[in-house]
Structures are given as structure tokens and as C-alpha cells.
Amino acid sequence: MIKIRKPNLQLIYVSDIQHSAEYYQNLFNFEPYFVSPRYVVFKVDGVADFAIWSGGESPEHESPRFAEIGINLETDTEVKELYKEWKADAGINIYKDLYTDVFGETFLVKDPDGHVIRVSSAD
């Protein structure tokens, strides 16, 4: 029997791979690990990857996608600091301003393709 690993790849579909790669490089503040004309990978840590993909040679744009990209920081203070930093960056679209939820401080960002990115403190 094959041992199933923990999920280690988060992949989202994008409409403009180059624009999205630049966007996430700015957002994450580090360079991609792998770059191709249709697929870009950012190494999150030694195990997990975050990837963006155009959907292949003939991407299917009609498929709905329901998900949220999560960035967990250590403390509410870090969430507040990152919110201020990103709020000042004209290239980052704050979708929902900083607020307190059951898990602590959080805010939402939308990427160029409308994917929602939630920043919050670790549960």
C-alpha cells in the first residue's frame, strides 16, 4: 500500500501567467522556484509548494473554482503590520479590510484573477 503524504501543493488557475507570477512574487517577497510559460512554482518551505498554472495549452475557463488561499502569520500583531504594508501597496487589492473573527485578526486580498487570499493569525 502506498503511504499518502500530507497535501503539499496548492495550485490555482490564472489567466495571465506572467502577470500573476509578478504579482505573487511581490506579495510573497521571494522569487519563484520554477518558471515556465504556463506553470510557475513558489517553494513555501522544504515540503510545500504554491503554484500558478494557465490551465494547459487550451485552458478551460468555464469551470468554477471555490477556494481560498490562506497565509497564517504567528500573531495578530503581524497580521495588522502586514495589512498596513499591503494597504499602502497600490498593486495589492484589499478585498476586505482588517477585522476580528473567531480565529483572530484577518483581512482578505484578491489577486488579478479574483482568487481570495486570507491573511490571519495561526489558529
Residue ranges of model-derived segments:
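Conserved beta-strand in the GNAT
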Residues: 50-54, 108, 117-120
